[in-house]
Amino acid sequence: GLGDVYKRQDINGIGYEVILKTLSDTRIAELCTPVIYGSSKIAAYHRKVLELPAVNLSIIAQAEDAGANRVNIINCVDDETKVELCQSTTAAGEAAYLALEAAVTDLKRGAVDVLVTAPINKHNIQNEQFHFPGHTEYLEQCFGGLGKKALMILMKDNLRVALVTGHIPLAQVASKITVEDIVSKLRIFNQSLRQDFGIVRPRIAVLALNPHAGDAGLLGKEEEEIIIPAIQEAEKKGVMSFGPYAADGFFGSQVYDKFDGVLAMYHDQGLAPFKTLAMDDGVNYTAGLSIVRTSPAHGTAYDIAGQNVASEESFRQALYAALDIYRNRIRYREATANPLRKQYFDKGGDNEKLDLTKEEDE
């Protein structure tokens, strides 16, 4: 089985619902050792109110105690926290932050391997330690290291959409798009496609900022002055990227099938078409960090909380994606650490005399 997976959520939204529905499938605990960071009491409340399938939760004090083939939970949230389904409350935000902080601490010391987060509410989680627009920015600070930037990738099957600008007002987008930033995002994207998705020579499509890709400068100069130079600059650094493509035609005629990744300039440009294609089972992956973190591509959904109608498909896919990426990273590390060994095994080992995998001094 694969190492521990950590999960946390907003207590008034659909977080516990999608987690419990996903983990009620006993096969999941055979793939990994799930550790929920939250409250067993609140989980039990959600299960009862929503009449969810029974999940036996094994309460543990620390991640190291997690038992295989069972669903573990670490109580890091005050049991007395009041659950008010469908409401955004400060208590819910506090609970979400405590769970996130506990899990991040365990990730940092290697007690858990991957992080799958259920949706948080961006408003109620804000406090003195957490003043970020969302998970991605918080995790970037925790795991980005020196100058390491996170990249948000929305994925479903072979469609992977990444963003140059994320959670900022639309009015600021044009001024925030620079050659340097596009090149940096292309390099992170390229590296992620190689190590996290096992693609040897990734092909990345770059979307234009303006309608009709700027129409030769009639509808804006960003393509000629910023995006095209960025594509050329990235090529010198070993990134195969193409474009800029006008976004409407690009998605309309399914050109995206020909690429391993799509780099959009701003949030809605990339996410509107993505969610049209993958609303129920899309996954949000935070690339560029030292740890693996995924989440469902949907929000807290207060409007349907407590009705047992939320689909857990996106959360299940987020869990599978985290496990796949974790395994791919291990394979990538092994392949790049010792390329000879990989070649040797790939070609089969019937000639025992010539063993390239032996160290000189063995």
Predicted feature residues:
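Contiguous, glycine/small-aliphatic-enriched amphipathic segments in soluble metabolic enzymes
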Residues: 4-135, 176, 180-265, 269-275, ...
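A broad structural signal for alpha-helix termini and local helix breaks/kinks
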Residues: 50-51, 143-147, 168, 197
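Ligand-binding beta-strand-loop-alpha-helix segment within the catalytic cores
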Residues: 154-184
